[in-house]
Amino acid sequence: MLAFKSDFLHIMSERGFIHQISDEKGLDALFSKEVVSAYIGFDPTASSLHAGSLLQIMMLHWLQKTGHRPIALMGGGTGLIGDPSFKDEARPLLTQDDIATNIVSIKKVFANYLTFGEKETDACIINNAEWLCKLNYLEFLRDVGKHFSINRMLSFDSVRLRLEREHSLSFLEFNYMILQAYDFVELYKRYGLRMQMGGSDQWGNIINGIELGHRLGTPQLYAFTSPLLTTSSGAKMGKSLNGAVWLNADMLSPYQFWQYWRNTEDADVTRFLKLYTTLPMDEILKLSALQGTEINEAKKILATEITAMLHGRDLANTAAKTARKTFEEKTFGENLPTIEINASDLKTGAGLLALLVQAGLAKSNSEARRHIQGGGIRVNDQIIEDETCLILEEDINAQGIIKLSFGKKKHVLIKPL
């Protein structure tokens, strides 16, 4: 790989962000001589991004930190269709109101990573519905559609693999690739953007935009993709046994977010410190040298640094403190997830199975029953073997709460009112 002269590409290379770049020398020269505006597209089909998007957000963070302008493109227009890339089935279509509501919610996250304003390197959030929803279809087909070869589009892995598995690809979704390519050209015309970044699964879509720009007379545009990350065990980033690891605090608490990263596999610690934190490389190298049980300290630092960037240093430290009290001091951490129940329910006894489901420690009564049969459920740190167990007033501790646990790392406090 090229020894980059520009700060941005040097950091991207050093920390492991680079999968593929369309023209390394040309892009490095561009970054070295001027402020570059670049963008990443984000899918607004949910009300929050999850941890799988954090790599791209960190790329925008470093872009701005090295003196360039980051743009977060919200797919308000393309989101009405859905990206078919490597999906086996079409997604349910959302309304424009659904998409708009999701975008408002998603925007909150970016303020924790980027500085917004009117300066040359200040970040901006743009919605592609601004131009896509105003397109004249016949004019678009005539002026843009003519530049796309169906034969070539069918050769893209994202499409080919889906067709090989005999999953249909609707004409609606096929248009997504053309619209995304058009986004790149439109963003150059409106904002002077020269580079699009994304995951490696977006390479074909980004190259389409570069080639369309060339045919329509733009200066050279550039593609930059990052690896599609999985954990060492092959799990997708941003997913846990309990579902998506959401970035919005109202969908996943800072403590639960911290705990997700604390549970990082040993083999992933160094890689994640490079990608998801801004710790200096020399400090990361020191942490990566830790062995045995000492690596747990590196995991705590990883979890705290990532949580601090998203939720703030105070909440990150509180999450770390809660974990320490819960796991090391065997006391009740102040920031553990808490649910409230009627105190009167405990007079006759509340069923443990139902409480486990209500607390989110099981998805159903049958799953809660399996947890108990496997010896994984504890009440106030005491293993429960009876699936008909009732939680009573006498189970309330001196702090006025009851602690439910599944395994060693999942705890919920029950607060009777």
From Swiss-Prot:
Which reaction does this chain catalyze?
Answer: tRNA(Tyr) + L-tyrosine + ATP = L-tyrosyl-tRNA(Tyr) + AMP + diphosphate + H(+)
Major enzyme class: ligase
Alphabetical list of Pfam families matching this protein: SYY_C-terminal, tRNA-synt_1b
Q: Which residues bind ATP?
A: K239
Q: Name one GO cellular component term.
A: cytosol
Every copy of the S4 RNA-binding domain together lies at: 350-417
Which positions does the motif 'HIGH' region occupy? 44-53
Q: Which family does it belong to?
A: Belongs to the class-I aminoacyl-tRNA synthetase family. TyrS type 1 subfamily.
What's this protein's name? Tyrosine--tRNA ligase
Q: Which organism is it from?
A: Bartonella quintana (strain Toulouse)
Lineage of source species: Bacteria, Pseudomonadati, Pseudomonadota, Alphaproteobacteria, Hyphomicrobiales
